[in-house]
C-alpha cells in the first residue's frame, strides 16, 4: 500500500523583521569584505519599534558607516513611510560592535596561510530531485510565493501590499514523491483601507497562480489568506527582528537536519556559513552526478582545527553504490578545509546580501557558487557509474 503523508515548509518576505535583520547584517559584511577581503566579521542585528541595534565583533582595516548601511537596507526593503510602522529616516541606530577576541583570531589565522575553523560546529547539506534546482518542493514553492509578494508590491501590481509577509506550503507525498500542493497559507501586511475579499482574491490571482504550476494545485486545495482577517501593523512595529532566527527558512524548510548555526553577518571563515555552503555543494553534485536520488551531507569542525573532524553522507537508500563509497569520494574530491572551501567557492566577495532573503540554496544566481554542479562528472568517473 502506498505511503502517503503531508509535509510543510515556510518562507518569509524581505520585509519580515527577522529577515530585515539578516539583510542588515549581511549588508555590513558585504561593505567590509569588499574593502578588506581578509576581515573577520560577526555582525548581529536587533530591530524593534523604531530602532536598530548592531552588535558583534570585527577585525578589519576599513571603516564601515553603520548608520548609513542600516538605513539604506531598510529603505530598499520598502519601509519608507512612518505609516508602515518603521521608517528608514527616523529609526534610531545604535552601533555596539567591538573587536574580535585575539584568542579566537590566533586559532583561525595559522602559519602557512592555513585557516582554522572559526568555531566548532556541525553543518548539513541536502539535495534531491524534487525540483530542477535539486531542492525540496515545499520550500521552493514557499520562497517563490514570498518573492512574488515583494515583486507585486514593488512593481505596483498590488499597491496595497506592505513589506512584511509570510507563506507556507503543504505538499502531499506518495511513496516519497511530491504529488500535489494541498494547502497554501499567505499572510501579508497591507494598507488599512483594502477589503479582505479584494486582498484575498488578488493574492490568489496575482501571486499563487503566477508562480505555482497548475498541475501541482490539488483539486481540493485550501487557501488561508491572512487568516486572522487583518494585517496592518507589521515589520519591527509588530514583532522584534533578530539575525539568525530563520535558519530553517534559510536552508531546506525542515526537509533535513540543521546544525543550529545561522549564516548572516558571518565572514566565510565561520564554518557555520561556509561549511553549510560546502555541504550543499557536495550534496547537489552527488545528486547531479546520478550517484543517488537524494543526499544528506554532514560536516563537523573543531575551532582552530583545519580539517573537518567528520564527514557523513546519507543517500536515504537511493544510491548506486554504498554510502561509504560516497563518503570516500567526497573526501578525495572535495577540499573541505575552511581555506579550501573559501577558494573553491570564491567566498571572499561581497555576495552575501543577496543570500539573506528567499533562501541561501536553490537559487542559481552567478554569485551562488555552491549551486554549481561542476563536480558531477568527476564524481561519476570516480564512482564508475556512467
From Swiss-Prot:
A single BP term in Gene Ontology: one-carbon metabolic process
Question: Top-level EC class, please?
Answer: transferase
Q: What cofactor does this chain's UniProt record say it requires? A: Mg(2+); K(+)
Reactions that this protein is recorded to catalyse:
L-methionine + ATP + H2O = S-adenosyl-L-methionine + phosphate + diphosphate
GO MF annotations in UniProt: ATP binding; magnesium ion binding; methionine adenosyltransferase activity
Q: Where along this sequence does the record place binding of L-methionine?
A: 57, 100, 239, 270
Question: Which residues does the annotation say bind ATP?
Answer: 16, 164-166, 230-231, 239, 245-246, 262, 266
> Residues that bind Mg(2+), according to the entry?
18
- State the free-text cofactor note: Binds 2 divalent ions per subunit. Binds 1 potassium ion per subunit.
- Subcellular localization, as worded in the UniProt entry: Cytoplasm
What are the boundaries of the region Flexible loop?
100-110
Signal peptide residues are none
Residues where K(+) binds = 44
PROSITE patterns cross-referenced by the UniProt entry: ADOMET_SYNTHASE_1, ADOMET_SYNTHASE_2
Note one Pfam family from the annotation.
Answer: S-AdoMet_synt_C
- CDD domains for this protein: S-AdoMet_synt
Does the record carry Magnesium as a key word? yes
**Pathway recorded for this protein:** Amino-acid biosynthesis; S-adenosyl-L-methionine biosynthesis; S-adenosyl-L-methionine from L-methionine: step 1/1
Q: Which family does it belong to?
A: Belongs to the AdoMet synthase family.
Subunit annotation: Homotetramer; dimer of dimers.
Briefly, what is this protein's role? Catalyzes the formation of S-adenosylmethionine (AdoMet) from methionine and ATP. The overall synthetic reaction is composed of two sequential steps, AdoMet formation and the subsequent tripolyphosphate hydrolysis which occurs prior to release of AdoMet from the enzyme.
Designated name of the protein: S-adenosylmethionine synthase
Species assigned in the record: Nitratiruptor sp. (strain SB155-2)
What is the phylogenetic placement of the source species in the record?
Bacteria, Pseudomonadati, Campylobacterota, Epsilonproteobacteria, Nautiliales
Gene name, per UniProt, is metK
Amino acid at each position: 500500500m502506498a505511503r502517503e503523508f503531508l509535509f510543510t515548509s515556510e518562507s518569509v518576505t524581505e520585509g519580515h523583521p527577522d529577515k530585515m535583520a539578516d539583510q542588515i547584517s549581511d549588508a555590513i559584511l558585504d561593505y567590509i569584505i569588499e574593502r578588506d577581503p581578509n576581515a573577520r566579521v560577526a555582525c548581529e542585528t536587533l530591530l524593534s519599534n523604531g530602532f536598530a541595534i548592531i552588535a558583534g565583533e570585527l577585525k578589519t582595516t576599513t571603516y564601515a558607516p553603520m548608520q548609513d548601511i542600516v538605513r539604506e537596507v531598510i529603505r530598499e526593503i520598502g519601509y519608507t513611510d512612518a505609516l508602515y510602522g518603521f521608517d528608514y529616516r527616523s529609526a534610531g541606530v545604535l552601533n555596539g560592535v567591538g573587536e574580535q577576541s585575539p584568542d579566537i583570531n590566533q586559532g583561525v589565522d595559522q602559519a602557512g596561510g592555513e585557516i582554522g575553523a572559526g568555531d566548532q560546529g556541525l553543518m548539513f547539506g541536502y539535495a534531491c530531485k524534487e525540483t530542477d534546482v535539486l531542492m525540496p518542493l515545499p520550500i521552493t514553492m514557499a520562497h517563490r510565493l514570498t518573492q512574488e509578494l515583494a515583486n507585486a508590491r514593488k512593481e505596483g501590481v498590488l499597491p496595497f501590499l506592505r513589506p512584511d509577509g509570510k507563506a507556507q506550503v503543504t505538499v502531499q507525498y506518495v511513496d516519497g514523491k511530491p504529488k500535489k500542493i494541498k494547502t497554501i497559507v499567505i499572510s501579508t501586511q497591507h494598507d488599512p483601507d483594502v477589503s479582505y475579499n479584494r486582498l484575498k482574491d488578488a493574492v490568489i490571482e496575482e501571486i499563487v497562480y503566477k508562480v505555482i504550476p497548475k498541475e501541482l494545485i490539488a483539486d481540493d486545495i485550501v487557501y488561508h489568506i491572512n487568516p486572522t482577517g487583518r494585517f496592518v501593523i507589521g515589520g519591527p512595529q509588530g514583532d522584534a527582528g533578530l539575525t539568525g532566527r530563520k535558519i530553517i527558512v534559510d536552508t531546506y524548510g525542515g526537509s533535513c537536519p540543521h546544525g543550529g548555526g545561522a549564516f548572516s553577518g558571518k565572514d566565510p571563515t565561520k564554518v557555520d556559513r561556509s561549511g553549510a555552503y560546502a555541504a550543499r555543494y557536495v550534496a547537489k553534485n552527488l545528486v547531479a552526478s546520478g550517484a543517488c536520488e537524494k543526499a544528506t551531507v554532514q560536516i563537523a569542525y573543531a575551532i582552530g582545527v583545519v580539517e573537518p573532524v567528520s564527514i557523513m553522507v546519507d543517500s536515504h537508500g537511493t544510491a548506486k553504490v554504498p554510502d561509504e563509497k560516497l563518503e570516500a569520494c567526497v573526501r578525495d574530491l572535495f577540499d573541505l578545509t575552511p581555506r579550501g572551501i573559501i577558494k573553491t567557492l570564491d567566498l571572499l566577495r561581497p555576495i552575501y546580501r543577496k543570500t539573506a532573503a528567499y533562501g541561501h540554496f536553490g537559487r542559481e544566481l552567478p554569485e551562488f557558487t555552491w549551486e554549481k554542479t561542476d563536480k558531477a562528472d568527476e564524481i561519476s568517473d570516480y564512482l564508475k557509474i556512467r
